């Protein structure tokens, strides 16, 4: 189970299992290649994490009064990449809505308000969640 221990904000955040979603996103984003880069080189690793997302995760940690910080190299580390995914979800998708979380990963937090964003990506990820190759 892929979870991230946070402060005692909400038990559901701590116990929600994102592993199936993360596994499908990894398949879509990099096919499991930790050294994958997109065409412009900004998105890196199994989850194709941008420098902006690393910075946002560090801002979230700072707001939690945590001393932990992520580096750009952490995008190539599977465990740390998954931690960043879960941290981002815990901040911007506290209800753990899977569809919102998938769309948000692809389109950013604006996808939380505009449900039309990321539909194609959502369908692609859900295909892998449902056992597609």
Regions found by a protein language model. Give the residues of each.
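Bacterial N-terminal signal peptides
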Residues: 1-3
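Sec/Tat signal peptide C-region and signal peptidase I cleavage site
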Residues: 6-12
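Extracellular/periplasmic catalytic domains that process cell-envelope and extracellular macromolecules
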Residues: 14-19, 40, 95-98
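Short, functionally critical alpha-helical segments immediately adjacent to catalytic or ligand/cofactor-binding
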Residues: 16-33, 49, 85, 100-108
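Short acidic-hydrophobic sequence patches enriched in Asp/Glu that either
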Residues: 17, 45, 117
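Secreted/periplasmic proteins that engage bacterial cell-wall peptidoglycan
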Residues: 24-63
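Secretory-pathway/luminal and periplasmic proteins that interact with or process carbohydrate-rich
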Residues: 30-36, 108-119
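Alpha-helical segment that forms one wall of the substrate-binding/catalytic cleft
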Residues: 51-114, 122-131
């Amino acid at each position: 189970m892929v979870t991230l221990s946070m402060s005692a904000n909400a038990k559901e955040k701590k116990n929600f299992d994102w592993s199936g979603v993360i596994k499908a996103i990894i398949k879509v984003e990099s096919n499991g290649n930790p050294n994958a880069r997109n065409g412009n080189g900004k998105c890196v690793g199994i989850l194709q994490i941008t420098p902006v997302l690393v910075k946002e995760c560090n801002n979230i940690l700072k707001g939690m009064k945590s001393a932990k910080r992520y580096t750009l190299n952490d995008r190539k580390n599977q465990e740390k990449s998954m931690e960043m995914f879960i941290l981002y979800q815990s901040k911007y998708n506290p209800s753990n809505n899977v569809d919102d979380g998938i769309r948000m990963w692809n389109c950013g937090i604006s996808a939380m308000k505009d449900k039309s964003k990321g539909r194609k990506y959502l369908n692609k990820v859900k295909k892998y969640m449902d056992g597609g190759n």
